[in-house]
């Protein structure tokens, strides 16, 4: 569960 999975903010 990576944050970037929901928040693609680099």
Curated annotation (Swiss-Prot):
<dbReference type="GO" id="GO:0090729">
    <property type="term" value="F:toxin activity"/>
</dbReference>
<protein>
    <recommendedName>
        <fullName>Toxin Tx1</fullName>
    </recommendedName>
</protein>
<keyword id="KW-0800">Toxin</keyword>
<keyword id="KW-0528">Neurotoxin</keyword>
<keyword id="KW-0964">Secreted</keyword>
<comment type="similarity">
    <text>Belongs to the neurotoxin 04 (omega-agtx) family. 02 (Tx1) subfamily.</text>
</comment>
<dbReference type="GO" id="GO:0005576">
    <property type="term" value="C:extracellular region"/>
</dbReference>
